[in-house]
Swiss-Prot record:
Ranges that cross the membrane: 34-54, 74-94, 112-132, 143-163, 173-193, 196-216, 222-242, 245-265, 294-314, 326-346, 362-382, 393-413
Record-level GO BP terms: regulation of pH
Protein task: Na(+)/H(+) antiporter that extrudes sodium in exchange for external protons.
Subcellular location, record wording: Cell membrane
Protein name per the record: Na(+)/H(+) antiporter NhaA 1
Species this protein is from: Clavibacter michiganensis subsp. michiganensis (strain NCPPB 382)
Gene: nhaA1
Amino acid sequence: MISPNPALPTPPHAPTAPGRGARLSRFLSRDTTGGILLLIATVLALVIANSPAADLYERVRGFTFGPEALHLDLSVSAWAADGLLAIFFFVVGLELKQEFVAGSLRDPRVAALPIAAAAGRVIVPAGIFTLINLGAGPEALRGWAIPAATDIAFAVAVVAVVGRRLPPVLRTFLLTLAVVDDLLAITIIAVFYTAGIAFVPLLLASVPLAVFGILVQRGVRAWYVLIPLGVAAWALVHASGIHATIAGVALGLLVPAIATARAGVTHRGTAGREERHALTHFFAERWSPISSGIAVPVFAFFSAGVTVGGLEGLTSSLTDSVAVGIIVALVIGKAAGITGASLLVARLPGIRLDPTLRWPDVLGLSFVAGIGFTVSLLVGELAYGTGSAQDDAVKVGVLIGLLTSAVIGGTLLALRGRWHAAASLHEPVPAAVR
């Protein structure tokens, strides 16, 4: 999940008034804030799920509400996964559109390395998980895509904390990798985790989607017009059997990424001149705080609560081949996939690593990219179902993989930061960080 550029001034007509609301919005849009809130929600869920309040937590998580006639009588946890995460995927759709139309993915030669890295970090972990679970039966193999996603909120937070001395292009590489990764994850969910499709609701969903697309192309950004259209599209996609978060992506991709006289936002720049920004930027500024500050942490709170059952319960989960496959795939598979694919593609004519980077930097980043959480838990729920025999194993595997990847990647990047700092000052570089 990539946050909008905080350096760009906020266009007018923002729904948040200046003052506390605007400051809160900027705070929630920061790279580190989303990761911290996600961590707090995860820890809180784990503590409550293993406390005397565990029964209350399960009752709240399983409480069902919503209009039954529209097939929207969902549990609280399902509303978080299907509803709130649609906001997260809407922001992802905005970022995909921006990067492919006007960003770093527009130039094929520049995009080749992170695209190859993203492909490697999906293929290699999926292969490792499959190999480990070959003898566990077809049910276990349904989770092959769990280690295929990176939680960019956590990953960027780690880089922001330990990578202040690293070249800025490393963060750009991570963000570009995340954009492609999000696209692959969306495709996997749509293709492999859709049980059956009801074509009538799916065709009906094209109506609000088309109206939404026409309106935003004409520069309409009134929330009271666009939000009802988005909700209608979401409900119809949900009724079709396709995971409802795909509606969020589709809506984001419909927003124009180039500022025009009709579809753009005008504001006065620092030099007093009027400037125009694309609607993707406008919507990302408004929805990113809601995504990182509310949608993703709430989803994490209702998804990460696993009852460990003491040391014996933890040991039991860790002996499950699903958990082992997830941990090894997240930690080793992603690092091998990203670094290996990048090394291979960098040998092609016209493609090379940025001169300010070294391959040890990419290796450290590849471990940080092993931090999978939001989409990994979502795929786990789609693969096995909430409350299934593998449910706890998925959560334990994802959490341990996240922690291990963060520690290894954070340590490597901190050492690389020391190397770059010493190199910039022309000082002797300690052997431990070369």
